[in-house]
Swiss-Prot record:
Annotated phenotype, changing residue 60 to A: 375-fold decrease of binding affinity to Nav1.4/SCN4A
GO MF term list: potassium channel regulator activity; sodium channel regulator activity; toxin activity
Protein name, UniProt field: Beta/kappa-theraphotoxin-Cg2a
Organism for this UniProt entry: Chilobrachys guangxiensis (Chinese earth tiger tarantula)
Signal peptide residues on this chain, from the entry's feature table: 1-21
Free-text comment about domains: The presence of a 'disulfide through disulfide knot' structurally defines this protein as a knottin.
Note: Negative results: does not inhibit Kv1.2/KCNA2, Kv1.3/KCNA3, and Kv1.4/KCNA4 channels. Shows an extremely weak inhibition on Kv4.1/KCND1.
Tissue specificity annotation: Expressed by the venom gland.
Similarity field: Belongs to the neurotoxin 30 (phrixotoxin) family.
Keyword Secreted among UniProt keywords: yes
Disulfide bonds: 55-69, 62-74, 68-78
Length: 83
């Protein structure tokens, strides 16, 4: 009896952990994707921000308001909007 209760609880914990990982997947970037975004995709293109400043997408981290240059979105670093 105790073993079946333990198995059910363990199954629920694993199910919750998997669903949490799927929800949080957009918040974390794999090391390979991070390196690709910093080096492979960096073409040193300057993009004007709303305030009139200029930035390079690979060198600006997202601020507390998750603001990025125009045409970019926050995903740890400011990255081009795809699609």
């Amino acid at each position: 009896m105790k073993a079946s209760v333990f198995a059910v609880i363990l199954g629920l914990v694993v199910l919750c952990a998997c669903s949490f990982a799927e929800d949080e997947q957009d918040q974390f970037v794999s090391p390979n994707e991070l390196l690709k975004s910093m080096f492979v995709e960096s073409r040193h293109e300057f993009t004007p921000e709303v305030e009139g400043r200029y930035c390079q997408k690979w060198m600006w981290t997202c601020d507390s308001k998750r603001a990025c240059c125009e045409g970019l979105r926050c995903k740890l670093w400011c990255r081009k909007i795809i699609g």
